[in-house]
């Protein structure tokens, strides 16, 4: 099985919160696609709570689009990582990490402005697979955590696992 890009970086050295370009590619028509690792938590030390990350998933996607789409950028998808330490964001375009970090912080400020669980988009049995598994207060705790610590940039060059380590891990 081929080694996925996300497993070629050293998770023990990742900073959080931080933005990292996880992958870049071009479509057959030449459009640039960038996948960002938006790392909310330090891997293996912190984790976002289940209900909070789910609520954040509903809010974050719209708020990030409000702040990042335009000027050659269009978000395709924002999805939580299975390890619950962050989100992957796929988009058309090549914004720099600082632009993404600024949009992320603005989106977190928007999360803090949501006053009632009824304001969470698609929070109903028809549009959500686990519509009762939500917590606005947990999502807002996550947002506060990001804004209190600021957002850094994780460099692939600094985080790359050496070939020797990959061989040692039998990858």
Curated annotation (Swiss-Prot):
The catalysed reaction is: S-(5-deoxy-D-ribos-5-yl)-L-homocysteine = (S)-4,5-dihydroxypentane-2,3-dione + L-homocysteine
GO MF, one example: iron ion binding
> In the record's cofactor note, how is the cofactor described as bound?
Binds 1 Fe cation per subunit.
For this protein, what is the EC number? 4.4.1.21
Enumerate the Gene Ontology biological process terms: L-methionine salvage from S-adenosylmethionine; quorum sensing
Q: Superkingdom of this entry's organism?
A: Bacteria
**Family the entry assigns:** Belongs to the LuxS family.
The molecule here is called S-ribosylhomocysteine lyase
Where does this protein come from, organism-wise? Answer: Salmonella typhimurium (strain LT2 / SGSC1412 / ATCC 700720)
- Gene assigned in the entry: luxS
